[in-house]
Amino acid sequence: MKITYKSAGVDVDEGQRAVQLMKNHVKSTFNSNVLADIGGFGGLFSLNIKDYKEPVLVAGTDGVGTKLKIAFMMDKHDTIGQDCVAMCVNDILCQGGKPLFFLDYVATGKLVGEKIAQIVGGIAEGCRKAGSALIGGETAEMPGLYAENEYDLAGFAVGIVDREQIITGANIKAGDIILGLPSNGIHSNGYSLVRKLFFEVLDMKITDYVEEFGTTLGEELLKPTKIYVKEILSLIEAIPVKGISHITGGGFFENIPRILPENVDAKINVDAWQIPPIFKFMAEKGNMSKDDIFGTFNMGIGMVVVVSKEDVNGAIAVLNKAGQEAHIIGEVVEGAKQVIL
């Protein structure tokens, strides 16, 4: 019996076909700093640092978690890549990092060229929104490790910031104002709880229309994570921003304290913005306490920005001009690095 790589479950030809199908998506993210075409052993990116006194690279990596299961259930793969980009670039934004380039990793049980091209198309869309070049990636076919129709997805973002412009939160003090930037739904965390509630406890189907959402359950759950790059960079250029927090896993209680000094609390007014129906629905149907749901989900606020009281009106004006809605959702008070609802 003749043994081949294909008979072992790895189709090299299909991998090459996938590269051809995704090529235009990848190239659509290129800019003049990209020095190598697709297919090299490494991505090459020329750093233009003439505008930086002491340039510092900022790097972040993340995945999409079990939101992938929603994409599998819907057989819709063209937006999940944007989630991956958003999770990475929004993180490096928190320290003032301007995204430069991105790399992706896709691993699957059985490689299907069209599906990979859809995934990479979503990654490319996210990169264009973030102003980031997609300069490299890996697509791995791993039979026996992943189910045939499933895949995992991870991304890696690198950005740049001037050392003296790094945002740390160290200068946050009592009296500062907390701004909230609306999310686009659940974003990309908490989906193990989401799936348990909707598909096990409530026994709902992905195709069910939910009146409160104005759409099907699947469409609501697969809304792509918002990318805040252009809006936040506009703000940083105009206003001395003291702290930025990306509200992801752990919700308000884990992410906001990451930027707080030891001697202050973040006092949040939960009536300051309209909490989206998806979160109200989950809180009611899942019998979740306020602490539970605010400690898991973004509750309609994807990014938190801290500025001084005298800069708050200017900050809101800059964000609004960039097309970004912003709410005053709280203030910094004396305390012990806690979030108070």
Swiss-Prot record:
Its main location: cytoplasm. Disulfide bonds: none annotated. The keyword Nucleotide-binding applies. It catalyses: 2-formamido-N(1)-(5-O-phospho-beta-D-ribosyl)acetamidine + ATP = 5-amino-1-(5-phospho-beta-D-ribosyl)imidazole + ADP + phosphate + H(+). One of its GO terms (molecular function) is phosphoribosylformylglycinamidine cyclo-ligase activity. One of its GO terms (cellular component) is cytosol. PANTHER family: TRIFUNCTIONAL PURINE BIOSYNTHETIC PROTEIN ADENOSINE-3, TRIFUNCTIONAL PURINE BIOSYNTHETIC PROTEIN ADENOSINE-3-RELATED. This is Phosphoribosylformylglycinamidine cyclo-ligase. It comes from Alkaliphilus oremlandii (strain OhILAs).
